[in-house]
Amino acid sequence: MYRIMIILVAGHTGAQTGAIGVNKSNYGRIDEGYETIWLRNRVAQILNEKYGCYVLLDDNKDKLAVVIQKIKSVVNKDDVCIELHFNSAKNSTACGTEVILSENPTDEEVKIGVQLLNTTAKALGTNVRSIKTERQTPHNQLAILHLPCSSIILEVCFCSNLHDSEIYFHNREKLAAALAKQIALIANKL
């Protein structure tokens, strides 16, 4: 029997390589390049230790093209790739959790996207914004969404929003546990 592989990718890996959040939070500011690594590693640790899931992590030093090449070389259609991000907007009132899927997502990707969206929003207490397709983003096409497996981008919250930033820092351990549990359920149901 094939064991589902979960691939967790930290978007914008490395300090100050992604969005940088507001500086008025009691916890400091979200540095997307750091927080995606922290969240990825914590979720993977829980998946391994508590649920016995097979988890593959991206290498923090690789460029996205290399990450995608490596993933393509080891996955099959039953596997699941989740890339973690923190959203940012010029409008500091933008808030909530989003999921991004390819233009033509599979039913399984939509199902997983809804589950991750709701799990994240519930764990953090953020608004459920939406599930978007890649063309509804400023980037138009996102390579990570074109793998030979189910692929989802999770925008955890808006680091440009003070409330989102504070509830993320206050609840990030709770979020990691909730995501790990949901991902373990996904892996066992596929």
Feature-to-residue mapping (PLM):
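Active-site-adjacent mobile loop/cap segments within catalytic or ligand-binding domains
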Residues: 7-9, 18-21, 74, 81-87, ...
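Solvent-exposed loop/turn segments at secondary-structure junctions
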Residues: 13-15, 60-64, 86-91, 104-107, ...
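Extracytoplasmic/secreted envelope proteins and their assembly/folding machinery
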Residues: 40, 44, 68, 97, ...
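Loop/turn elements at helix/coil->beta-strand transitions in domains of secreted/extracellular proteins
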Residues: 2-4, 48-54, 76-81, 123-127, ...
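Active-site histidine-acidic residue metal-binding/catalytic motifs
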Residues: 1-69, 95
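Sec/Tat-exported extracytoplasmic proteins
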Residues: 43, 47, 51, 75, ...
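Second-shell loop/turn segments in exported
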Residues: 26-34, 56-61, 100-106, 162-170
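A short, glycine/acidic-enriched catalytic loop
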Residues: 15-31, 88-119, 123
